[in-house]
Design a protein with these regions (language model features):
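Asp-based, Mg2+/Mn2+-dependent phosphohydrolase catalytic module
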Residues: 2, 7-45, 52, 56-57, ...
Length: 166
């Protein structure tokens, strides 16, 4: 067995692609000082179940305060979502947080589009999300920092099973 293989025959670098760099309970626990300490100036955010539950379009005040605090601290925020629904662009317009939809995570197209929009290098960029197989893996594939948070709401049997496996 070569040095790059795990005991399961999967290359170790592929196994590590599923591990986030940092874990927080909620997105609002991430602080501007933490991001600056790690050289992050662009924070890409998954939308559904990271920022808001699927079941609502109305953010709670702590999220709005967090967004304002990040923006006041000079952290650029951008939603990067796989969603095809209008709720993401609607939120984006209403609360002045830009977005990239149809991002196709774990592919890197949407992530790279957001980075290009703001002129951010991979080492200056992080993506926060609630799903290992889309958000964390997409971040790792793009060469950026991956931050995992607990899913706000598991509303379907499929999501409950998927999060249990993760």
């Amino acid at each position: 067995m070569g040095t790059s293989e795990s005991t399961y025959g999967i290359p170790e670098e592929n196994m590590l692609s599923f591990l986030p760099d940092f874990i927080f309970q909620t997105i609002t626990q991430i602080r501007p000082a933490f991001l600056r300490e790690h050289g992050i100036r662009l924070l890409l955010m998954d939308f559904d179940n990271t920022m808001l539950p699927y079941t609502t379009d109305r953010p709670e005040q702590p999220l709005l305060d967090w967004i304002a605090g990040m923006q006041d601290a000079g952290i650029t925020l951008c939603i990067v979502s796989n969603s095809h629904k209008q709720r993401v662009p609607h939120f984006s317009q209403q609360y002045h947080v830009p977005c990239v939809t149809h991002a196709a995570k774990p592919g890197t197209r949407g992530i790279r589009e957001a980075m290009a929009r703001y002129g951010a290098a991979p080492q200056q960029t992080a993506l926060v999300g609630d799903q290992i197989y889309t958000d964390v893996l997409g971040a790792k594939r793009a060469g950026i920092t991956a931050i995992a948070v607990r899913s706000i709401h598991n509303h379907t049997v499929w999501l409950k099973l998927r999060h249990l496996l993760e």
